[in-house]
Design a protein with these regions (language model features):
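One-carbon transfer enzymes
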Residues: 1-267
Length: 267
C-alpha cells in the first residue's frame, strides 16, 4: 500500500541505520537495541560517563561523546546550556558531524532515549522528521519533563495516563504524534492518591504550580507526596508504555517503511 505524504524511511537494499542519544541509564536505548541487535547504530551523549554510554561500548557500538558542560564553558564561557542561539546550534553541529562520520553518512533515524538536552532549532530543522522522542504523558495535554506530566494528569482528574512517541520539531514536545501507549489506569494507586485528590477537590486546584503553592501554605507536605507518587507511576508507565511503543515505532513502523508525513499529518 502506498502511503500519502513523504516516507520517513524507504527500505531498499539496506536496513535502517539509527543514532541514539543518551544522557543517563540508557534503558530506552536498551529496549530499542534489544528489539533488533543487528541494526547498525551509533550512540551519542553529552554525558560521557553515563550508563547508556557504557552499555553501548559493551555492545561494541560506536560512541560519540561531547561533554555539554565543558563545551559551553570552554567554547563560549557559558555556565548553563543555552536553549537557543548560535552557541546552542554549534554544539549540535559538532555532535552530528561526529555522528555522520561514524556512520559514514546521515542517520536514517535519530532516537532521543533519555537525552537531557533540548534539541536546537538547527538540528530540528535539518533532520525533521527523522528525530523521535518519547514523552512521559499525553503530549497533546500535559507538557514538562520527568514526573510532571503525570502530576498534571492527576490534578486534572484523569483516570489514566499514557506515553507518547513523537517527531521532534522546534516546539517543546509538541511535534507530530506517531504512536501512544495503552492507557495505564490510575485506579491501582487510588489508596495512595486519596489525600492528594481530596486536597485538589477541597482547594479547587487546577494547575501544578497552584498545587505546590497551596500545599506549602497549608504545610501538609502533599507537594512532596505528589512528586513521589508521580515518579512511582512514571516508572510503571516507562515499563508498560515507553518500553513497548518506542522499539515498535523504530523497528516495526519506520524501519519497515510504514510511516509518512505530509506537513504535520502522520500516515
Amino acid at each position: 500500500m502506498r502511503l500519502k505524504g513523504k516516507p520517513v524511511f524507504i527500505p531498499s537494499d539496506r536496513a535502517l541505520r539509527y543514532a541514539c542519544g543518551v544522557s543517563g541509564s540508557g534503558t530506552n536505548y536498551d529496549k530499542i537495541y534489544e528489539a533488533d541487535p543487528k541494526k547498525t547504530h551509533i550512540v551519542f551523549s553529552n554525558a560521557p560517563d553515563c550508563s547508556g554510554v557504557k552499555k553501548a561500548r559493551e555492545r561494541n557500538a560506536p560512541v560519540v561523546t561531547l561533554d555539554s558542560d565543558i563545551y559551553f564553558k570552554k567554547m563560549w564561557g557559558i555556565e548553563k546550556v543555552p536553549r537557543y542561539g548560535v552557541e546552542r546550534n554549534s554544539y549540535d553541529m559538532a555532535v552530528m558531524t561526529l555522528v555522520e562520520q561514524g556512520l559514514k553518512g546521515e542517520p536514517d533515524l535519530i532516537c532521543l532515549a533519555g537525552y537531557d538536552l533540548w534539541i536546537g532549532d538547527w538540528m530540528a530543522k535539518r533532520y525533521f522528521p527523522r528525530i523521535l522522542n518519547v514523552h512521559p504523558g499525553d503530549s497533546r495535554k500535559y507538557t514538562g519533563l520527568g514526573w510532571r506530566p503525570t502530576a498534571k494528569a492527576i490534578i486534572a482528574g484523569e483516570k489514566s495516563v499514557k506515553s507518547t512517541v513523537f517527531f521532534v520539531d522546534e516546539s517543546d514536545d509538541g511535534g507530530p504524534i506517531l504512536i501512544q501507549s495503552k492507557s495505564i489506569s490510575l485506579s491501582r494507586w487510588d489508596e495512595k492518591l486519596y489525600d492528594i485528590k481530596k486536597f485538589i477537590e477541597k482547594m479547587d486546584i487546577k494547575t501544578l504550580s497552584e498545587f505546590r503553592e497551596k500545599a506549602k501554605q497549608e504545610g501538609n507536605n502533599l507537594d512532596i507526596v505528589l512528586e513521589a507518587m508521580s515518579k512511582e507511576i512514571q516508572d510503571v508507565l516507562k515499563e508498560e508504555g515507553d518500553w513497548m511503543i518506542y522499539p515498535f515505532a523504530v523497528h516495526n513502523l519506520i524501519a519497515r517503511g510504514r510511516v509518512a508525513l505530509d506537513g504535520r499529518k502522520v500516515y
